[in-house]
Amino acid sequence: MEKAQDYRQDNPGLGCAKLYLIIKELFEETGCMPGRDAFIEILRKHGLMVHIRRRKHYKTTDSNHNYRKYPNLIVDLIPTRPNEVWVADITYVETTEGVCYLSLITDAYSHKIVGWAVGPTLETTYPLEALNMALASIDDETARRLIHHSDRGCQYCSAAYVEVLKQHGISISMTQSGDPLENAIAERANGILKTEWLYKMTIATRAECKAVLERIINFYNTRRPHMSIGMQTPEVAHGQSGEQRRCWKNNYAMG
């Protein structure tokens, strides 16, 4: 139980099935690992089950603008390498001082968060900061083989953001509707951060928010296994190539 408690402390919203697989891998050779149902019952008795807290919703996408909107280039595309498709999105983070907005860029192949930034407004400054962080991790040739996919929000369609993408020779792809399935991997990354961490904590100040997010994103990238990449961490998957093995049939169902 000590290992399970440690993981719960670092990742309070991690699902019981994933937690079981992590602990099983650590202790299976000892011969004292219970079955999944028995393990979940032990979690219940020790008060280690997941409890979801819903929060207020904040609008983060404004598609009512006159900027050019680009076509969706990734319909039915299954990435087979890292840095083939990056997906971008903005979500909110509540603090006692007020809301902050988190800009994320996630690799569609490995699900690794490769760029992020947080700020008090929805200005394009913060998505650009996340983009520049991601770009710092690749060379020019890799950038020219990359697709950047996002919703049609004004930040991603803005002249400043599009200019950076074009300067690096990156192909621009955007959703064609408000259907979250058109940007499912980005939505899933947002959802994991919120339901497994942010909904379960109180962040006192906006200044504290960045340090908290840095710790969470590091755990997400290096320690949280994903069913969409064969129960590997994003960091491990980011060093691979070839189609990833999923642990279920529907790519949008889980993460």
Label the model's feature ranges:
Residues D107-A108, V118-T125:
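A short acidic/small-residue loop/turn micro-motif
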Residues A4, L19, F39, L43, ...:
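Mobile genetic element proteins and their domesticated derivatives, centered on retroelements
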Residues T60-S63, S150-R152, S158-V162, I172-K194, ...:
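RNase H-like two-metal-ion nuclease catalytic core shared by retroviral integrases
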Residues K166-I170, I192-G255:
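C-terminal domain-tail junction helix/linker
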Residues D37-L104, L128-M133, S137-I138, A143-R145, ...:
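Mobile-element integrase/transposase regions
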